[in-house]
A protein has these predicted regions:
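ABC-type nucleotide-binding domain
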Residues: 1-169
Length: 169
């Protein structure tokens, strides 16, 4: 299949159909045994994994958070980001107000694998991380699956804005 730059493509199918495999192939977690994966006409096997990973942002269904602060977990998408940039990404992901209610704000530690946060809060931190990274290609792997309907609608609006002029799966 082909996804033109700046367009969005929804990949739908039952569990085990290979939806997540597509993102793994894009990231070169493994190479194809047949056929090719091209990004902007270039075979991903001819590019470094680092450059691919810099160009692609993923919001997975099962968010990975580090046993560190909320700020660190958001800024992981762009090391060296300023506090203002981190907070702006958090606002877009609808998590800033929640963070500001915590006793230590952005300095709050999330615990091992983010266990101190709900599924929806972890998901919003992951979305903020990807927004901050500002990649050319977005992969949203059931990115709003852990959110309530109201929050999902708010984040969908933010994701539409972030997806503008980016290739999105």
């Amino acid at each position: 299949f082909t996804v033109p730059p700046g367009r969005t493509l929804a990949i739908v199918g039952p569990t085990g159909a290979g939806k997540s495999t597509i993102s793994r192939l894009l990231f070169r977690f493994y190479d194809t045994t047949g056929g090719r994966v091209l990004v902007d006409g270039q075979d991903v096997r001819d590019v470094t994994q680092l450059s691919l990973r810099n160009a692609i942002g993923v919001v997975p269904q099962d968010t990975v958070l580090f046993n560190d602060t909320i700020r660190y977990n958001i800024a992981y998408g762009r090391p060296g980001a300023t506090d203002e940039q981190v907070e702006q990404a958090a606002r877009h992901a609808q998590v800033h107000d929640f963070v500001m209610k915590l006793p230590e704000g952005y300095r709050t530690r999330v615990g091992e694998r983010g266990l101190k946060l709900s599924g929806g809060e972890k998901q919003r931190v992951a979305i903020a991380r990807t927004i901050l990274k500002n990649p050319r290609i977005l992969i949203l792997d059931e990115a709003t699956s852990a959110l309530d309907t109201r929050t999902e609608q708010e984040i969908q609006a933010a994701l539409r804005e972030v997806s503008r002029d980016r290739t999105t799966l």
